[in-house]
Amino acid sequence: MPGGEAPHSFEFVAAPTDLAPYLNSLYIWRLGDEQFDDVLPAYSGQMVVFAKGVGRMQFDDEVAETSDAFFLAPLCQARNFSVNGPAVLFGASINFRGWAALSGLSVHDYHDCFLQPGTVLEDGTAQTLSGLAQRWSAGEVDDAALLDAMCDIIRRGLSRLPEQHLTVIDKTLEWLSSSFKPELDDLYASLPYSKRQAQRLVAQFFGQSPVRLVRRYRAVRAATLLSMPQLPELIEAEIREAFYDQAHLIKEIRFFTGRTPKRLMPGAGSSINEMLGPDGYSSVNLFGSGESEQLGNDPLDDF
């Protein structure tokens, strides 16, 4: 970015306990009086209140502009975006269980796009969400109250998922967490469906086939680990072995995260890197048990 990093901050806020099964986290992003250009990684769905400023995101041949409130459907690849400051954004990062329970929309059909509140929510809650930016600007609600209001909207919008659908989501997440290169047969064996049905349901809840989903999470997982300081050599070697060669590693990480290994280094200076960490991407255990032991983490803490 010309002139160096714009003055901005990214604050994660823990989701309320009752919403923890559905959300990665809440967050507040602030930008000073400058333009900020970056790339958002292939990330889960977001509910957003753009309280100040305006942003744009590139979706293939279309540039979409933000509104006061909107949903960002789950991303299947990294996307370029630009924000004109000053800006303040409030967000709820919705994991794949939450997206299915809140929206009821197939990720195969709705991904990599902005959605108006009425596409996801019933009319009353959609109107409430759309009015939050104006209420914040008028001083009727502060930061904490706005996030609380977003949580209330999510609570009102959640529906109960069939147990078999929850099984597909949770078993797929467990499978993705098990290895850099999990075996497809292991996934199919864990699901109460035929191979063809399993592929269709994985695409419905995650937007991509199991084969492509492995590519996506392998890249995100590798990017997360490479962004950590003092990465043990054994883990770095495991990352290298998961890709054909260095060129393949760079290509995959760039496609799914918008980063290169150099830009992921500690101190590289992008708050968007924080979204690749466990606070921002907690629906999948990005650290398998072997990596967790070497990093001194309890793998259960990464969910």
Regions of interest found by a model, annotated:
Residues 215:
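Short, conserved glycine- and acidic-residue-centered signature motifs
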